């Protein structure tokens, strides 16, 4: 069952209109000043969601300056717990770009494993998962279908 209905009304509306604007500060951007500056720009620019690195203190500092819903991104499911407690609205397995720069790629099986671990830890929190662009197109489609079966609420793709 989808948890989309747990997201703020505005986010739900924009998702259904296929026009959600999510600004990403970066999976590994833990610089509070940088993320706060991005958050301010996102709010001024009309963003619907701010996607930040998964760190509770970062969530708290960003929520001090914006009312935008916060999505936290990580590839270690255990990290999500404290960020959700700190106020993150939803969670995402994704923003893999910082790993690609290091030559690290995520397989479909790795993404599925991370998804299952995350759903086990936080079954009542909306979950977004990014399908890696490094997979062949047919493998991306297969993974997306498997993610739906796993109960993922939002599936994202990467553009390269």
Regions of interest found by a model, annotated:
Residues 2-160:
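Alpha/beta enzyme core
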């Amino acid at each position: 069952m989808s948890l989309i209905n747990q997201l703020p009304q505005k986010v739900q509306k924009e998702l259904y209109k296929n026009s959600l604007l999510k600004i990403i500060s970066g999976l590994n951007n833990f610089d509070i000043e940088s993320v706060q500056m991005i958050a301010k720009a996102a709010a001024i620019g009309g963003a619907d969601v701010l996607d930040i690195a998964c760190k509770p203190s970062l969530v708290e500092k960003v929520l001090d300056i914006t009312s935008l819903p916060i999505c936290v991104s990580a590839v270690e499911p255990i990290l999500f717990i404290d960020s959700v407690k700190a106020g993150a609205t939803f969670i995402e397995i994704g923003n893999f770009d910082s790993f690609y720069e290091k030559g690290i790629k995520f397989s479909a099986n790795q993404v599925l494993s991370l998804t299952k671990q995350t759903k086990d830890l936080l079954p009542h929190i909306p979950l977004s998962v990014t399908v890696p662009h490094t997979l062949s197109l047919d493998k991306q489609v297969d993974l997306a279908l498997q993610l739906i079966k796993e109960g993922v609420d939002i599936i994202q793709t990467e553009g390269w």
